[in-house]
């Protein structure tokens, strides 16, 4: 079938997922997608003539109508409502690059909002602007990989659909006057997928069906990460962990930043013995103290290093750079062979820094890779997919040899990267109030782009002196917010930012939130299971849960952490109250006081240095850790189960061994918990799953005014072994 000069093909991957493909010539160019999984099943749906110049394709959920006369493509839901309207498209030949530029235009509905596209906040002082907006109305956004800027060609609409473009080149998305204009620098075809759902969760689930699930990280990855640029010796880094333990501050991960290679040259995959004389002993000492070690690794190498010479001799260095080529199978395997040396030492996580890649050369958008022949194709065709392929090298490398879960921290990302156990962070941002505000919509857009694990340099990379109250306040507010991010991590340059570096009153607040993070771990880990098993999103723009309430569409500084907790971070200095919107058709509980409040309104919430506005949805059954721990791996044998009455509620408490991939084989357990509002009964069902479970003490608290989060005296205490159902009546 043709529209103008272009051939068009329509494929249904599922009832609610449609692929649209435009190309010149008789047959589509067949190549292996880097993003979309291979061998996806397709529905057998053929086009039918349904009117003059109209060809239609229909499933139970969607119909696609193509007007071969005027070129319009319209997708409708099963009630006839318009989902997507593509007005035009073009493949324009670019003589300079000898390829085609991709151009498209979509017509949006009045009031429709668009989210996603990765992370675009700036705030690093390198010329990028900080945008505080969550939706992209009135903006033009460049899709490229830069420090603090992550380009992902996936949008999500407030109407309940998403569009994923299978294109890896430099791109631009412009949204003005209800028109969405799309441009990519290079493409032999136009290739995109529309995903529709009853909810935005359905859209993200469809995105993961196309691009892969997000594996569970090990349990310790959801605890507290301490980092700085940099710990300069073996003695220094082990002494920091020791001090955490002596001060009884929970800690799971300590991070070793760059330059540990010393005399061996840039990123040599070796430790300089002057400062790191016994690296294996260092790792073992950290492990004995109940912590894990992450290490910085770069995609570039000093020309004097053995690894560079080896890579170059095997054709694995990209011409004109010192970066390895992750688009070649043998080069990914070679890169992993060097990373494996760290794995063999017992190192637990890999920090793949500057994975754009930052080469130290080139202009803002056009790195030296842009014009190079990568063998798979021209650099400009594959530019944005570099971090996807670098993380693939490490993830697949470790999975081939080990059942131990992979953990990758990386500065850049691309569509599909969630399948590589990759956590992204927002880059080298400034440590000021404006940048803090910008991080929130940046993280929300990244999360709704389908990649669930995200964090920041808490307090900013370029930060102030922790001994000053002005900076200490910024850090505390940032830390409070980071407690409710998928990953909690502190990092920065010049000044160390361990909790004890701050004035006493600020230090106490930091410790309060570290302990709160650990109380939340049973909830967070259960959300991680949902992320893997049903395509869930942990850090959630309000539009995901309250799409019927149009008031929430533009809230840049409020979001849901899982299904229950509403967060409104404090992002201005010295304030004593903050205006917060509680979504409609809900009752809410003040997290700190237990007071029940009606939704559908704005309200002024008082804040102190040690509190931010936090609210819990009625119907929540919130499982918290009921004891103090040093790290996330200690057994969760005491659970505080907080019940927030007001409507029916259900939650599944999940656990497994926390270390291996045995959960993929059913080695886990789930505890189903149900709150019946009419009967005022809590039912804890028999555990499901193949993993054996030791008994737990469950302390039940019926939340009401005066029973905020710091109220820990249970109303009912039960012993639970998972073998029988227990029902508890509220007294």
From Swiss-Prot:
User: Taxonomically, which superkingdom?
Assistant: Archaea
What the entry lists under InterPro entries is as follows: DUF5110, Gal_mutarotase_sf_dom, Glyco_hydro_31_C, Glyco_hydro_31_N_dom, Glyco_hydro_31_TIM, Glyco_hydro_b, Glycoside_hydrolase_SF, Glycosyl_Hydrolase_31
Q: Which GO terms describe its molecular function?
A: alpha-D-xyloside xylohydrolase; carbohydrate binding
> Keyword Hydrolase: yes or no?
yes
Catalysed reaction per UniProt?
Answer: Hydrolysis of terminal, non-reducing alpha-D-xylose residues with release of alpha-D-xylose
Q: A Gene Ontology biological process annotation?
A: carbohydrate metabolic process
Temperature remarks = Optimum temperature is 90 degrees Celsius.
| Annotated catalytic residues | 353, 356, 428
**Keyword set includes S-adenosyl-L-methionine:** no
How activity varies with pH is as follows: Optimum pH is 5.5.
Return the similarity comment.
Answer: Belongs to the glycosyl hydrolase 31 family.
Quaternary structure per UniProt? Answer: Monomer.
User: What role does this protein play?
Assistant: Catalyzes the liberation of alpha-xylose from the non-reducing terminal glucose of xyloglucan oligosaccharides. Has high hydrolytic activity on the disaccharide isoprimeverose. Follows a retaining mechanism of substrate hydrolysis.
Q: What is this protein called?
A: Alpha-xylosidase
| UniProt organism field | Saccharolobus solfataricus (strain ATCC 35092 / DSM 1617 / JCM 11322 / P2)
The gene is xylS
